[in-house]
Amino acid sequence: MKMKKVSRRDLLAGGASLLALGGAAAYTKAMRAKPTVRETGPAISAFLPERDLAGLGHPMTAYAKIGGVELSRLILGGNMIGGWAHCRDMRFYDRLVKAYFADERVFRNFRIAEACGVNTILTNPALMRVINRYWREEGGKIKFISDCGYKGGVIKGAIASVENGASMVYFHGGHADSHACKGEWKAFREYLDESRKLGVPVGIGCHRLATVKFCVEHDCLPDFWMKTVHRVDYPTAHLGEDKKKSANGLGVCDNRFVDTDRQEVFDYMQSRPEPWIAFKVLGAGIEHPRGAFPVAYSGGADFICCGMYDYQVVEDVNVANDYFANGLPDRTRPWHG
């Protein structure tokens, strides 16, 4: 049999391919290695390229408990990972972020968050699969708070979430606003009663301050609040407002996620004894964390939930750490949690 002559160029190319395959296999094996002890920030950082944590001053040091569950004061938001990007009129963007966040990219996001001391992801039951895969295959320990937005309703969403490892659950904000607008206080009472049977802290989420007031008025008090707070002085904040056509009273455009300015929220929450997780503090990208985080913490937020791409986590953790290192300037509301 006549052998094919192999050129020097073919030989070098083949060798390079083998080296690349070998390197990829070694990298994959290293990334999937399972530590036998509970992973802390420094332990997880050993499994990340140094560049991923470049610029990190130190991991989060501020933690507090809600109902016995210890949370970092900065929580990773999961809207972007699930494809709910809130990008105004850029309708293509939801599909773009879903394509970006393939499972391996989600794992990377979680690994960086944990290495930076962010120990919790807050998201929808739709992400239960990838979260469980991360725990199972990557050895991750990140905690999961579920918004219970589920095809069978929020109570079934709470049950499914806890069965899949959720440490805490809360009444989805959009659904809560709609029920409050309709005066359906019994929906909150039923959710709180049924979800508390699951043995985890139970919250109520909302975008409207009126929803918080409605729940308080009807003695539907959760273990914690999920309440939006952000600036409303940006150019698109009031575009397309037509509250009469919106079931939740917020208008139909994806431009704004509150019904009042920040100060009104801060003033009301000042007297509430329940822990408050603030979300949408950046207004879905209209303000930098350097401006928004200190305002939210100083205004009374006990925790901030913020969507962060993998390349944003280090900077956002540094901003949060700087606030706590500076002596909690201007905060008057007692810390809860």
Regions found by a protein language model. Name each.
Residues 313-333:
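C-terminal helical cap(s) of enzyme catalytic domains, especially alpha/beta-barrels
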